[in-house]
Amino acid sequence: MPSKSLSNLSVTTGANESGSVPEGWERDFLPASDGTTTELVIRCVIPSLYLLIITVGLLGNIMLVKIFITNSAMRSVPNIFISNLAAGDLLLLLTCVPVDASRYFFDEWMFGKVGCKLIPVIQLTSVGVSVFTLTALSADRYRAIVNPMDMQTSGALLRTCVKAMGIWVVSVLLAVPEAVFSEVARISSLDNSSFTACIPYPQTDELHPKIHSVLIFLVYFLIPLAIISIYYYHIAKTLIKSAHNLPGEYNEHTKKQMETRKRLAKIVLVFVGCFIFCWFPNHILYMYRSFNYNEIDPSLGHMIVTLVARVLSFGNSCVNPFALYLLSESFRRHFNSQLCCGRKSYQERGTSYLLSSSAVRMTSLKSNAKNMVTNSVLLNGHSMKQEMAL
């Protein structure tokens, strides 16, 4: 639909009661359709960026899931959640990104009523899986660092799989209203030409989009991030307190342990930071449009902001494997070995501990005199004391 101008357009079917143009559909348009340099550049550059996002995202996330599935040492509670993130990203990359890219080649909605109902549900489900999984990961890091005695390994993987499935169920249920209200409508211009478009909430009043955008921002952004912030506040406080309280003669031993804990928490925090950076502009833009329901901004600046927000939000689906590659030595080694087609899969010696605090049973014996914590690790039935690192 990019070739349609924003001016002289109206909704002839599926219009809201006030007769105003529904929020949402105008974001798919370029400012003009006269073959200008701007239009031609956008038609080429944006789909190319989408193709890059799809290619890189599929490679990284498929490799991530494959590594966790094929290497038993990598199967842990945090890694199950990370695989859940990758699955949600793959869903978005395989469905929503190609559909969005097609809008720069075709003047009309090409995916029918079913596609109009399904695509918004898939996108919101993917966002829900991402932010709710990040919240669950933060809770896991909180328990591992602040309350290590509460970490139980008996049935932990099974319980985590159930939690991951629960995240999907909740995300799908929350996205169902998108399918209920989205409709394919025909947009008419004053020159008697018309085209079809997928419009969210076309038959509602001005209040509905405002409520919807605020709820989306709260449920899928602000509230989860507030919970994550609380978890990380307590994590930071515990790490600082532990560094001050541990006796000097054990500094070398505890330093490695502390670095491991901080590294694990850092990985999750980087994931959260990437999510905020990529999705915040999209949330703000959606609320801006919802609160300016009757106005259409045909300016080049608004169009550029819209395109940047879209590219950033879709780009979030390919950044997590890169972050993990940079921050985790174990994942980096396994990833490199997978890329080397002629080599055997890298078999890691010793204990792999990529976010695997729950893959082992840890019991803490606290000394009242020296406030020292000694971890006794049980792995495959054998007791061993060691410092585990990425």
Swiss-Prot record:
What do the Gene Ontology cellular component annotations say? cytosol; plasma membrane
Q: Give the sites modified to Phosphoserine.
A: 352
One GO molecular-function annotation for this sequence? Answer: bombesin receptor activity
Give the residue spans that cross the bilayer: 42-65, 80-99, 118-139, 157-177, 212-235, 267-287, 300-327
Q: InterPro entries, alphabetically?
A: Bombsn_rcpt-like, GPCR_Rhodpsn, GPCR_Rhodpsn_7TM, NeuroB_rcpt
Q: Where is this region: Disordered?
A: 1-22
**Residues bearing a lipid moiety (S-palmitoyl cysteine):** 341
Keywords noted in UniProt: Cell membrane, Disulfide bond, G-protein coupled receptor, Glycoprotein, Lipoprotein, Membrane, Palmitate, Phosphoprotein, Receptor, Transducer, Transmembrane, Transmembrane helix
Q: Which residues lie on this side of the membrane: Cytoplasmic?
A: 66-79, 140-156, 236-266, 328-390
Q: Which GO terms describe its biological process?
A: antiviral innate immune response; G protein-coupled receptor signaling pathway; negative regulation of interleukin-6 production; phospholipase C-activating G protein-coupled receptor signaling pathway; positive regulation of interferon-alpha production; positive regulation of osteoclast proliferation; positive regulation of respiratory gaseous exchange; sneeze reflex
Where is it made, tissue-wise? Expressed in epididymis (at protein level).
What is known about its induction? Answer: Up-regulated in response to infection with influenza A virus.
Composition skew (Polar residues), residue ranges: 1-19
Extracellular topological segments: 1-41, 100-117, 178-211, 288-299
Positions bearing carbohydrate: 8, 16, 192
Q: Which one Pfam family would you cite for this protein?
A: 7tm_1
How would you describe this protein's topology in the membrane?
Multi-pass membrane protein
| Disulfide bridge positions per record | 116-198
* Record localization: Cell membrane
- Explain the purpose of this protein: Receptor for neuromedin-B. Contributes to the maintenance of basal sigh rate through signaling in the pre-Botzinger complex, a cluster of several thousand neurons in the ventrolateral medulla responsible for inspiration during respiratory activity. Contributes to the induction of sneezing following exposure to chemical irritants or allergens which causes release of NMB by nasal sensory neurons and activation of NMBR-expressing neurons in the sneeze-evoking region of the brainstem. These in turn activate neurons of the caudal ventral respiratory group, giving rise to the sneezing response.
Q: Which family does it belong to?
A: Belongs to the G-protein coupled receptor 1 family.
UniProt-recorded name of the protein: Neuromedin-B receptor
- What species is given as this protein's source? Homo sapiens (Human)
